[in-house]
């Protein structure tokens, strides 16, 4: 929380490996994050949303959340190509986990809709659900209410409180 131009997004970009600080260090649970790639930092437990919504607009709501779960995949490329081994079981588990998150955000009823077809406020909630799917230790919300009307903002605040209580 801070005024425009205070450097919030720049700080988020440094925390998530988009920018590299010129001096100092960034640690999470004693591990240095400097020099790590964004996907490596995500695996270490840092997730974020953006000022401008960045969803996969042509994917379903469910599939958008599942993209956040892919850092936890344990099956091989061959298993995924040919639906062998643990692929079906793991995909079913990902579907269940994604639906659980969608229920938290009251998006389970639109799981099969394209993300692009959701109202703006629901797209924001979907972006947060996808970030939570990575199972983060630290969740960074960059201007989460930007562009929302007062009703959407109030609903988002209530949802964030539910997330705080449920996911700590």
For the regions a protein language model found, what residue spans apply to each?
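Glycine-rich phosphate-binding loops of nucleotide-dependent enzymes
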Residues: 1-168
């Amino acid at each position: 929380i801070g005024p425009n131009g205070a450097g919030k997004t720049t700080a988020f970009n440094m925390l998530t490996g988009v920018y590299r600080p010129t001096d100092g260090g960034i640690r999470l649970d004693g591990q240095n994050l400097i020099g790590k790639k964004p996907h490596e930092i995500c695996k270490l437990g840092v997730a974020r949303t953006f000022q401008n919504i960045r969803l996969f607009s042509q994917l379903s709501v469910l599939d958008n959340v599942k993209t956040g779960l892919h850092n936890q995949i344990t099956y091989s490329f061959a298993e995924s190509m040919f639906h062998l081994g643990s692929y079906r079981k793991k995909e079913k588990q990902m579907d269940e986990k994604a639906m659980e998150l969608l229920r938290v955000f009251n998006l389970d009823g639109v799981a099969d809709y394209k993300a692009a077809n959701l109202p703006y406020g629901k797209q924001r909630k979907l972006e947060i659900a996808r970030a939570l799917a990575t199972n983060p230790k630290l969740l960074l919300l960059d201007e989460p209410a930007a562009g929302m009307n007062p009703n959407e903002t109030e609903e988002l605040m209530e949802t964030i409180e539910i997330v705080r209580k449920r996911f700590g």
